Swiss-Prot record:
Gene name of the encoded protein: mpl1
InterPro entries, A to Z: AB_hydrolase_fold, FSH-like_dom, LovG
Annotated function: Esterase; part of the gene cluster that mediates the biosynthesis of the mycotoxin citrinin, a hepato-nephrotoxic compound to humans due to inhibition of respiration complex III. The pathway begins with the synthesis of a keto-aldehyde intermediate by the citrinin PKS (pksCT) from successive condensations of 4 malonyl-CoA units, presumably with a simple acetyl-CoA starter unit. Release of the keto-aldehyde intermediate is consistent with the presence of the C-terminal reductive release domain.
Gene Ontology annotations for the cellular component aspect, listed alphabetically: cytoplasm; nucleus
Species, as recorded: Monascus purpureus
Protein name per the record: Esterase mpl1
Keyword Hydrolase: yes
Keyword annotations from UniProtKB, A to Z: Hydrolase
Active site: S174 (charge relay system), D259 (charge relay system), H287 (charge relay system)
Any GO MF annotation of the entry: hydrolase activity
Family of this protein: Belongs to the LovG family.
Length: 313
């Protein structure tokens, strides 16, 4: 009788998937041991006996379904599962306020070097944009369609899980941050020309981690007077401005001060985002997502401030 009571008590335990992930070794074989389900990362093979027992007896309840949603775009040569792991500390600080949904880029790619050093077994790796001549050429309209399809697919999948929160923000790292800024700029142009109800999206803010200039054009029919490169071009070289394409939707930019390309990140901040709507967080790190508590807290604070400023529900 006493043993049965103990088992029932064990079945009621809740172990956060983020708690599990933060205690795993850095070099994981993710496809073999983890599966991403909405906002959760759960083991598919026994990692530790106690975890297996709890997972077997417990149906995890997702308590973020009603929260406002932030769509997250990974960097080039990465993927959605890797980016979710990289953002685990940020999610932990904001999980009672926002639901984070991670999109998968449409095009296959080699792993980015920093990704390869930690997540070499987490492939396949993907990209949003071309960054080297070896990437196959593609027509701009086909690239835009593939990107939009990926984003709409992940939104529909999240709706199907029962999520109901408004899509209030975009969050991206590196190439994903460039995509987030470009998506916000497209929304801004559409809202100016068509009105807010016909823009196709209504994101209130963007969180741009190590995002580099320039923006890319995601709607050539509307950007008739734009000097932006199209989405099919290689755009990693320094952009020679000044730019007439200025994003006014509020953004927070996160720059690692030891990132070798921080000058390109500053160019996106200074030349492509309006002074009255941009914020900056600088931290002592290189080209990666912040993980230390104090660094993450600065980013989380600015996200809360943006949400308040923009009236995000």
């Amino acid at each position: 009788m006493k043993g049965q009571t103990g088992l029932r008590s064990l079945a009621l335990l809740y172990i956060s998937p983020l708690y599990i992930l933060e205690r795993l070794p850095l070099k994981l074989s993710a496809p073999d041991t983890l599966v991403v389900r909405g906002s959760f990362i759960v083991p598919t093979e026994p990692l530790y006996p106690s975890i297996t027992m709890v997972q077997t007896n417990l149906e995890v309840v997702d308590d973020t379904l009603h929260l406002p949603r932030i769509l997250c775009l990974h960097g080039g040569g990465s993927n959605a599962a890797i980016f979710q792991a990289q953002c685990r500390r940020l999610i932990a600080q904001l999980r009672s306020e926002f639901r984070f949904v991670f999109a998968q880029a449409p095009f296959l790619s080699d792993a980015e070097p920093n990704v390869m050093s930690v997540y070499s077994q987490w492939g396949p790796f993907r990209r949003w944009l071309r960054w080297c001549p070896d990437h196959p050429e593609i027509r701009p309209e086909d690239a835009i369609r593939a990107i939009d399809d990926c984003l709409e697919d992940v939104k529909r999948q999240d709706d199907a899980k029962g999520a109901t929160g408004a899509w209030v923000g975009l969050l991206g790292f590196s190439q994903g941050a460039k995509m987030c800024a470009s998506l916000l700029y497209r929304q801004q142009i559409r809202q100016e020309l068509r009105g807010r109800s016909f823009a196709g999206s209504d994101y209130r803010f963007g969180v741009l981690l190590a995002g580099r200039a320039p923006l890319v054009s995601l709607d050539p029919d509307l950007d008739l007077n734009s000097s932006l490169p199209d989405v099919s071009q290689i755009t990693d070289a320094k952009y020679h401005g000044p730019s007439q394409d200025v994003l006014r939707i509020p953004t927070v930019h996160v720059h690692g001060m030891r990132d070798p390309h921080v000058d390109l990140h500053r160019q996106l901040f200074e030349e492509f985002c309006a002074p009255e709507s941009r914020r900056l967080v600088e931290w002592d790190g290189d080209h990666r997502v912040p993980l230390k508590y104090n660094d993450v807290s600065l980013v989380a604070y600015q996200i809360r401030e943006l949400a308040t400023q923009t009236g995000a529900p």
